[in-house]
């Protein structure tokens, strides 16, 4: 039975689904994984080892095709070009890059879909922002592992798994939730647990985290801290050590393992006092207002629209 997750006030905010909540399997179904980069390789190997009839859909003789052959996938048996893989599959897992998906979908996947098939995504971007509009007679689901493909594979091989978010955008067959939960089980994700969400919430929260915290905010914060010390005359090596190395090598692992309070309880009293005295001075209300502005751009579709247009015009050249 699903385990309820409650906040500090006792309100149920989520339900954790684990192995005992899986009520069906994918026996008799064929799974086509489209793409063989980080997530594609990690996920497909796990599905195959879990006994699911798994095939790959790739560009023939590309680098991913060659890697797949090295990993034991066999041409015309378990390795096909994308259109043929889609024709053979009951479930199609889209794990090529977000930027490449719309063109590949339109040219090679959509013409080969038939009623009752399932499209599975690992990120909600193209569905939520309507870069891909599936027909009404297919299921549209998502399994978003909270870790890169290499870690997904390593955790699976260790007998555990990486947690994942699950969502169903379109349930034509009436079995979309059962099937995506069974797929999560085959990935090992139900061992730590999976959570139900929506395509909207997954992509908007994911983009927000990347931009204001994980990839954008942290990088700029560290950069400003480093520059402040160097501009004040401190040795750049010392500045790097204090502002970058200790964040990733000491503080982040402590916060990951023990939480923010546990991290503060693990550092010196002087460090704790400094954090409490200056943390909000640096990350003040103005910073929060900037974060809200970033979130608004994500929610309105402004960021997605600008990114899609930029990619169509320049590719990765502007990055």
Which residues does each predicted region cover?
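NAD(P)-dependent Rossmann-like dehydrogenase/reductase catalytic/cofactor-binding core
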Residues: 2, 6-16, 234-319
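NAD(P)+-binding Rossmann beta1-loop-alpha1 motif at the extreme N-terminus of oxidoreductases
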Residues: 2-76
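A short helix->loop->beta-strand "cap" motif at the edges of active sites that frequently abuts
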Residues: 52, 113-117, 136-138
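Active-site segments that bind and position negatively charged phosphate/pyrophosphate groups
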Residues: 199, 203-260
